[in-house]
Amino acid sequence: MTEPAKLPWSDWLPQQRWYAGRNRRLTGAEPSVIVGLRDDLDLVLVDADYADGSRDRYQVLVRWDAAPVSEYSTVATIGAADDRTGFDALYDDEAPQFLLSLIDSSAVRSASGAEVRFAKEPDAQLPLEAMAHVSDAEQSNTSVIFDRDAIFKVFRRVSSGINPDIELNRVLGRAGNPHVARLLGTYEMAGADGTPETAWPLGMVTEFAANAAEGWAMATASVRDLFAEGDLYAHEVGGDFAGESYRLGEAVASVHATLAETLGTSQAAFPVDNVLARLSSTAALVPELTEYAATIEERFAKLATETITVQRVHGDLHLGQVLRTPESWLLIDFEGEPGQPLEERRAPDSPLRDVAGVLRSFEYAAYGPLVEQGAQNTDKQLAARAREWVERNRTAFCDGYAAASGIDPRDSAPLLAAYELDKAVYEAGYEARHRPGWLPIPLRSIARLTTA
């Protein structure tokens, strides 16, 4: 059990795409929990400490000696300890199947006061013989796909508490909602008092949506088709996305209705303090926000005395979080806004938070190609066509949502606009840090929303 402590964690962690400390200086990283799953496989929780006093805890499954799949050898190799080499086990040929078998048998593994519990959902069938490969998708966790049957999401940055991705998938699946992939199993480290509130969720397995297309890919393909047909309106182009936007609106409304029925609703004040705090911190980073700040503050302040209906929602919904299967739309990744504490990600919010997320995603799908081409400020015709595409799909989505729920988001225009503004402010901060070339997209939207 001493070998994991000898691995070069401070060198390896910052190289991983799921590492969350890129804007902080790492001062040290060492294992805090080591649980042996078998002789050549350890579950390790690594505490990463930063110069600002903060700490993250990461989960790494370490396979000893066995060579990983060759194409991943560099990213998977952690380093040497004594006479053995440690690898990220998720890239191994066989270790993921073993982890799946632990879930299938509802196994328990213990060491040094830590207990890891694997659990299969009732009546779940796990593909124990399926071939496994790591998904190439950029994300904050690591997903392993088992043929066309299941996807195993291993949480990387972990914390104690009820994980909303597991919680909401379970609730929606057991309620029979058709717009989520069925939860098959989970695993967690037990907390000090044995309750879900103190447990450390570590991963989950759901059905894999074979033959599914990502909403983002479908939407951007539609935009490219529109741009290629300079003499046609959006509804005349073969790749028109409005029908899918309508059906997506129906799916989101269905999920919201199930969550409201099963977990309830309540009344709460509009979170004016939270949105103003985000605006203040982002404006300090993005000087371009200064000219809009007073108007945004005024819009938010008008809602300060409003009482709104809140419930559990997705929390970070956009076109990259939805999949189109041959039968319907599926919503995935119910983790909420990345980087926020679990308690905040589980907090009830207005369903308009999710609606605004999709509407903002339409803006990105339409204007992203212009940014990539460097044409966002020069090609007036393409910009006009992008706006046409956005408005057509906004309308279709809201129409579908209203048809399925009986509640039209546009009837709460000031509140919906406030959630859109809050999301655009968040996007401005993200783009300023990571993709400055994309900053005009949220800034353009903020200008439009503050003059509407």
Swiss-Prot record:
BP GO annotations: carbohydrate phosphorylation; glycogen biosynthetic process; trehalose biosynthetic process
Gene3D superfamilies xref list: 3.90.1200.10
The protein's annotated pathway: Glycan biosynthesis; glycogen biosynthesis
Disulfide linkage: none
Ranges annotated as spanning the membrane: none
A Gene Ontology molecular function term of the record: ATP binding
Catalytic activity entry: D-maltose + ATP = alpha-maltose 1-phosphate + ADP + H(+)
UniProt keyword terms in alphabetical order: ATP-binding, Carbohydrate metabolism, Glycogen biosynthesis, Glycogen metabolism, Kinase, Nucleotide-binding, Transferase
EC number: 2.7.1.175
InterPro entries associated with the record: Kinase-like_dom_sf, Mak_N_cap
Top-rank EC class of the record's enzyme: transferase
Family: Belongs to the aminoglycoside phosphotransferase family.
Binding partners and assembly: Monomer.
Summary of the function given for this chain in its UniProt record: Catalyzes the ATP-dependent phosphorylation of maltose to maltose 1-phosphate. Is involved in a branched alpha-glucan biosynthetic pathway from trehalose, together with TreS, GlgE and GlgB.
Name of the protein: Maltokinase
Organism: Mycolicibacterium paratuberculosis (strain ATCC BAA-968 / K-10)
